[in-house]
């Protein structure tokens, strides 16, 4: 008999930095998930990734208190800020530009995010990334 899934939990956890402290511990504890077991498994799975990168994780937990999780790629905004060396986006996107990004960099970000984006081809993925860049106050050039 298959395990019965009780629910799912979506979190964004820095790569290699899952700890039982808030906000992770309480979110998992409320659902009866073994916090230390998740932290060890998550940190092991993300040790090859860039330290501190925010990794979206979807945790599926079951009736017998076990769980499985799947990792996604970091958000587009993380890649954009990293490419242009920004701390944060524009306070007034569309009016105040905080930097420029080339189409080549947009393409490389779209290729990295392709498996998580709801796009059929790289051109559609690039348009999604361009939209995110514009909403952060970045100018797309090239």
From Swiss-Prot:
<comment type="subunit">
    <text>Part of the ribosomal stalk of the 50S ribosomal subunit. Interacts with L10 and the large rRNA to form the base of the stalk. L10 forms an elongated spine to which L12 dimers bind in a sequential fashion forming a multimeric L10(L12)X complex.</text>
</comment>
<dbReference type="Pfam" id="PF00298">
    <property type="entry name" value="Ribosomal_L11"/>
</dbReference>
<keyword id="KW-0689">Ribosomal protein</keyword>
<comment type="similarity">
    <text>Belongs to the universal ribosomal protein uL11 family.</text>
</comment>
<keyword id="KW-0699">rRNA-binding</keyword>
<dbReference type="GO" id="GO:0022625">
    <property type="term" value="C:cytosolic large ribosomal subunit"/>
</dbReference>
<comment type="function">
    <text>Forms part of the ribosomal stalk which helps the ribosome interact with GTP-bound translation factors.</text>
</comment>
<dbReference type="InterPro" id="IPR000911">
    <property type="entry name" value="Ribosomal_uL11"/>
</dbReference>
<dbReference type="GO" id="GO:0003735">
    <property type="term" value="F:structural constituent of ribosome"/>
</dbReference>
<dbReference type="GO" id="GO:0006412">
    <property type="term" value="P:translation"/>
</dbReference>
<keyword id="KW-0488">Methylation</keyword>
<dbReference type="InterPro" id="IPR036796">
    <property type="entry name" value="Ribosomal_uL11_N_sf"/>
</dbReference>
<keyword id="KW-0694">RNA-binding</keyword>
<dbReference type="Pfam" id="PF03946">
    <property type="entry name" value="Ribosomal_L11_N"/>
</dbReference>
<dbReference type="InterPro" id="IPR020783">
    <property type="entry name" value="Ribosomal_uL11_C"/>
</dbReference>
<dbReference type="InterPro" id="IPR020785">
    <property type="entry name" value="Ribosomal_uL11_CS"/>
</dbReference>
<dbReference type="GO" id="GO:0070180">
    <property type="term" value="F:large ribosomal subunit rRNA binding"/>
</dbReference>
<protein>
    <recommendedName>
        <fullName>Large ribosomal subunit protein uL11</fullName>
    </recommendedName>
</protein>
<keyword id="KW-0687">Ribonucleoprotein</keyword>
<dbReference type="InterPro" id="IPR020784">
    <property type="entry name" value="Ribosomal_uL11_N"/>
</dbReference>
<dbReference type="InterPro" id="IPR006519">
    <property type="entry name" value="Ribosomal_uL11_bac-typ"/>
</dbReference>
<dbReference type="InterPro" id="IPR036769">
    <property type="entry name" value="Ribosomal_uL11_C_sf"/>
</dbReference>
